[in-house]
Amino acid sequence: MVLFRIGNCNFIDDLTGAGTKLYGGRWSSVGKPGLYLASSRALSVLEVLVHLQPLFVPDNYCLLEVEIPEDSIQKVQVESLPENWKDISAPAQLKKIGDAFLTERKYLALQLPSAIVAAEFNFLVNPLHPAMAKVKILKQQPFNFDNRLIKQ
């Protein structure tokens, strides 16, 4: 399965989960290494844009294409989540789900519903899982955001 990530070119190929360990994420707490990837290039763009300050145009960003094995993916069903799971301030239960996944190390990746686009998915990859050795970077290229996408 090919997944995508957009981020600062200086860190884009770091698959150790160091950024998530430092800052946490919607589905993981600070202190837990994890790698967030998206199911499409377009979703990767949206995941960056929703966090930008108005009028900020990111530069020095890259798009990373990553291949992960499909035989070690656990899926989170929307029906199992609290009603407010899409809220900007995500409920604590989401971090509990992700933290448990990362701690158990039973699967390489956790498929997560996107809070931005219905029927699209993000993935939380556990860099400490043994199958991480099978994860491959396929392509890295500079990425420029179209100025029309930036909040005015």
Descriptions of predicted regions:
Residues 2-17, 28-30, 57-152:
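Active-site and NAD+-binding cores of ADP-ribose-processing enzymes
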Residues 27-47, 51, 124-128:
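Extended catalytic/binding region for NAD+/ADP-ribose chemistry, centered on the ART fold
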